[in-house]
């Protein structure tokens, strides 16, 4: 008998085109299982799958991945807020993020940010109708706790997690005016 625990990443895109899969295993993993998981994984120039020896290793890799994404999303949110408070429009901010793409300083999160900034419904920017509230599922907190336990400084991840917690502590989001 073999034990295989896996975690995946990709959201909607992963559901459509296959997820990135992180497999943790306790003992040797069979070639059949490797092939099956590889077949359903996302593809770039290779299969988007990693095999990590050690029970729970796949979950650990996913946790660290999510912590890094927390930091990236917080950086994007801070850039957005600075530009917005500087009276830049959604279109101007989207153009700023597009320029990062042209300078090879892009990421998937930056690419979707410029798309989100341009989305309208009934002539109104969708983003302007969303309250600045960010929930979490616990992996950011777990990443912070793990980094503290291992004595590894992760100030960007901690600050990003803290910003999410603080966003939940606002009494009345209707009082906030970004314009």
Predicted regions, residues:
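Electropositive phosphate-/nucleotide-binding environments in soluble metabolic enzymes
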Residues: 27, 58-61, 70-73, 77, ...
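Conserved Rossmann-fold dehydrogenase catalytic segment
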Residues: 10-17, 40-70, 88-105, 110, ...
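A conserved active-site cap/scaffold subdomain adjacent to cofactor or substrate pockets
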Residues: 125-179
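Rossmann-like NAD(P)H-binding beta-loop-alpha module
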Residues: 19-42, 63, 74, 82-88
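Inter-helical turn/loop segments and adjacent helix faces that build the functional surface
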Residues: 83-96, 147-152
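Hydrophobic alpha-helical segments
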Residues: 66-67, 77, 114, 141-145
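Short, small-residue-biased leader/transition segments that mark boundaries at the very start
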Residues: 1-5
């Amino acid at each position: 008998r073999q034990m295989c625990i896996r975690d995946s990443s990709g959201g909607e895109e992963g559901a459509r085109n296959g997820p990135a899969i992180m497999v943790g295993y306790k003992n040797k993993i069979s070639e059949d299982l490797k092939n099956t998981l590889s077949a359903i994984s996302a593809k770039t120039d290779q299969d988007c799958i990693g095999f990590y020896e050690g029970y729970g290793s796949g979950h650990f890799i996913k946790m660290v991945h999510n912590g890094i994404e927390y930091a990236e999303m917080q950086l994007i949110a801070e850039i957005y807020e600075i530009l917005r408070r500087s009276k830049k429009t959604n279109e101007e901010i989207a153009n700023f993020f597009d320029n990062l793409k042209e300078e090879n300083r892009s990421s998937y999160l930056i690419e979707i940010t410029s798309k989100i900034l341009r989305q309208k419904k009934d002539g109104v920017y969708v983003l302007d109708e969303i309250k600045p509230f960010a929930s979490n599922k616990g992996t950011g907190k777990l990443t912070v706790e793990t980094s503290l336990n291992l004595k590894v400084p992760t100030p960007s991840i901690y600050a990003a997690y803290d910003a999410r917690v603080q966003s939940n502590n606002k009494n009345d989001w209707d009082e906030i005016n970004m314009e």
